[in-house]
Amino acid sequence: EVSINKKNAEDFVLWKPSSEEEPSWPSPWGKGRPGWHLECSVMSKKYLGDKFDIHGGGRDLIFPHHENEIAQSCCANDTEVFSNYWVHNGFITLSNEKMAKSQGNILKISDFKNNVNGQALRLALISAQYRQPLDWNDKLLEESQKTIDKWYKSYVVLDKPKLISDDDLYPLYDDLNTPKYIANLHKLYEKSQSGNLEDK
């Protein structure tokens, strides 16, 4: 059902009236406040300019939020482009359920800081490509810790270490394909176990 305040079903709020409890400012349309999409466009313009390089957010914000930001920002700034690159991350789920405060199933970094290796935590978090969902569980963290331990046990200080090749780094240039990059690191580890210092 289309709101009586809309001329078209696709219209979105630019300015809305405020209740007594909400912040408000005077305007030609009466006392009110910016709509959700406008808040973000204004902050972006203030701190980043009419156009900027990278805009990010969760996958759930692609539509309508980011689409509406683009529409109003390009119109207001008379630009063809609002952001050069859009980076939308997948959700981290817990037992295949979206984390939500209302469900009481959220994890905080502070939950891990005293008993989890930060490198293992980072490795676990990048085990899925950033656009994809990641189901968090104890096994994922345990496997990541085992991998970090394994890599460190084979660590050798070399006078002239070899740089990681462009081929091995390539997945990072391919939309930050971290799972493929980690697979390449595993292959490099296996190669380094050959006993040949040239491969380390």
Which stretches of residues belong to each language-model region?
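Alpha-helical recognition segments enriched in aromatics with Gly/Pro capping
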Residues: 1-146, 152-159
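Helix-loop elements that line ligand-binding/catalytic pockets
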Residues: 133-136, 140-198
